[in-house]
Amino acid sequence: MDLVEELVNVVGKKNVITNKAKSLRFRKGYRSGKGDAVAVVFPATLMAMWRVLNVLHDNNIIIIMQAANTSLTEGSVPAPGYDRSAVVVNGMKIKDLQLINNGEQVLAFPGTTLFHLENELRPLKREPHSVIGSSNLGASVIGGINNNSGGALIRRGPAYTELSLYVWIDEHDEMHLVNHLGIDLGKTPEEIITNLQNRNFDLNQVPATEHHASMFHHEQVVRDVESDKPIRYNANPKELYEVSGSSGHVAALAVRLDTFPMDKKTQMFYIGTNNPDELEDIRRHIMTTFKELPVSGEYMHKNAYKLAKKYGKDSLIVIEKIGTGHLPQMFALKAWGERFLKHIPFFKPYFPDRLLQTLSNLFPNQMPKRLDDYYEKYDHYLQLKMAGNGIEEAREYLKSYFDKASGDYFEADANETSKAATHRYVTAGVAIRYQELKQDSIDILPLDIALASNDYKWFEHLPKEIEDKIEHKIYYGHLLDHVMHQDYILKPGVDAHELKKKCLKFWMSVTLFIQPNTMLGIYIWQHRP
């Protein structure tokens, strides 16, 4: 019996894809990256996943664990150059979640999305560790834990837990199921998985444990504005714990996580300035003197605002009008359309994206007037969101600060708050849309930059020999914890990997330390000149 037949025996024929065209969207990253796989497998239960992993291990197959495939740094798709065959194991059919201890914690499974968890917690007036950003793309809870994702919500920090159920292969090449959920589910893998799936325990009497189910020291780290280290970055040793930060080196079947009380009242302060130092002054004052940490503090540059307004309009409309619940199905429909039209010579590559872009031009401007007014006046924008007593703290401080500073601010209403936040998050797809409209005639270089907490001069100034190779620079990110997304749209003929080398060489000359990510992101402890 060959490998594919063994997999079909476990999960059924409809849950194994071997056709290259049909499997492409699971072998290709959201922003970049693509590799080969013998098959893409979709186990529908934890027991099926356990059996699939055993089949793959017995056949000496490289296992690529995948959830929603919303990773921006190629981590959930195969890469070229493997020494043996690979199989993608996609867990999105295992959608269950279990609220435990009256919703104060949750057990999430491979297909549990942040959107699903948000909806389940909303009647309890509670929230997951992350409720903005990647949740708009249908991201999975376990995918976030695997990569310590998140951190945009300043009070909660990156996704983290010390309580999980996972599979790993030891130094003797033996596979093990490890139950560190803090719940007695039996001894054998079959007992543990069956009891978990069937909820054979009291969900509201799960015993407390000394192990953490969320990032427990983030406030201390994020408030230290004099540290010469980054606040958060991939593979931070302090955030690596079994499944947390494992980046697919173990297979997570379940994680136990804290949930958080929903804020009763929030307020966004929309700040504009032509001097980025003013935003850093605000950050430092808030982090060192405010009693209440902000909910979030999202940054956008003028060029990012402009390009997202044009190339992200259709995404903004979908999210604002339809919501995020149907996004996975819409992505699947788009992928099917691309695959179908690829075989018809009349249609050019990326036709669905070109059609969506054309249709978006028929809709009126979606951005509120005050946000557009700030775009005309200022180059840098900060969306500062406060909650509870922090609202008045920010109100008093910003009024005093901008009596003397060159920029300005306003208190956003509900529509402005929603549009600003969604506009900021659709920016992540702008470079891809631009490239697709150019039919791959240009390249893009997306980077994630983790600056030192004490880096006052955080805004980038590239040397001319690099600047001349870039058509557009899209700067956006999480200002309060100094993590920046910098997407470069390159001029025709410029090679992204060669330019990346030049960028690294430049950054090495001005930084204390550089840590390249395993894929595309670059994480820097930096003092810019």
Model-assigned labels for residue ranges:
Residues K264-S296, N303, K310-Q357, K369-Y401:
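A conserved active-site cap/scaffold subdomain adjacent to cofactor or substrate pockets
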Residues V16-K20, F42-P43, I63-A67, E74, ...:
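General beta-strand structural signal in soluble alpha/beta enzymes
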Residues A139-N146, E298-D314, A420-Y425, I489, ...:
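Short, conserved secondary-structure transition motifs
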Residues R122-D277:
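FAD-binding subdomain of flavoenzyme oxidoreductases
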